[in-house]
Amino acid sequence: MASELAMTAELPTSPLAIEYVNDFDLMKFEVKKEPAEAERLCHRLPAGSLSSTPLSTPCSSVPSSPSFCAPSPGGQPSAGPTAAPLGSKPQLEELYWMSGYQHHLNPEALNLTPEDAVEALIGAPHHHHHHHQSYESFRPQPFGGEELPPAAHHHNAHHHHHHHHLRLEERFSDDQLVSMSVRELNRQLRGFSKEEVIRLKQNRRTLKNRGYAQSCRYKRVQQRHILENEKCQLQSQVEQLKQEVSRLAKERDLYKEKYEKLAARGFPREPSPPAAPKTTAADFFM
């Protein structure tokens, strides 16, 4: 009974705190019994801590609650500048120990009962961790003086280098590389790195060799077609000449045969005309 009176005497007198505490019906929850060692761990503050709120138990993930009980007899008061004096009432910030879970424990906003708020509070650490992971994905990109990890530097440099290569390779078409003179190409490549210039010139040399090989192949094919056409024309002319030779040979043989027949029979002699009678002068005067 004396302990209940002592606890009642040390309860906060602020109306806001009393109203905040009275919203919860905590009497229906069972009190977890813990060993004395766990109780000592609960009442011990970490080194350098400025808060008078004890730590939570090792077996529980529920955030630590404000301490309304009297200090242990063997405990020593904290020597920190902000520590509360021995036997003093809890500070006002201890009454708002659940301020980090306002989105869980706001019955007016979520239309929840106090029991639902306590259940949400019990599952709050895991939920907070889940939200922390989800918020990590929406972290803004670093600017200016913020440091980037080496992997991010390498990724950004590789992306910029690859984009630079694409711009250089897409700057000239194949026809421009082949038709452009060496002087003009060197003038266009000023300001680029040596590796990019060497790669582009190798590409230009490959294109020129490929074009030269295609030109030679085209010329060979064209020359072969010309020679094949001339061959066909000459073959047709030879056939025509052969036919003409055979015709002339036949005609020669025909004339030769006629000549031989005529020579074998002999040519007939034509009859001489009759001689005119001689007239004398005596016949003339007769």
UniProtKB/Swiss-Prot annotation:
Domain called bZIP: residue spans: 199-262
GO terms under cellular component: nucleus
Region feature (Leucine-zipper): 227-248
Keywords on record: DNA-binding, Nucleus, Phosphoprotein, Transcription, Transcription regulation
Superkingdom of source: Eukaryota
Biased composition (Basic residues): 152-166
Phosphothreonine: modified positions: 53, 57, 113
Start-end of Low complexity biased regions: 51-85, 277-286
GO molecular function, one term: RNA polymerase II cis-regulatory region sequence-specific DNA binding
Family affiliation: Belongs to the bZIP family. Maf subfamily.
Assembly and interaction partners: Forms homodimers or heterodimers. May interact (via leucine-zipper domain) with MAFB. May interact with FOS and JUN. Interacts with PCAF; this interaction impairs MAFA ubiquitination.
Cited function: Transcription factor involved in transcription regulation during lens development, including that of crystallin and filensin/BFSP1 genes. Binds to CRE-type MARE 5'-TGCTGACGTCAGCA-3' and TRE-type MARE 5'-TGCTGACTCAGCA-3' DNA sequences.
Protein's name according to its UniProt entry: Transcription factor MafA
Natural source organism: Gallus gallus
Lineage per the UniProt record: Eukaryota, Metazoa, Chordata, Craniata, Vertebrata
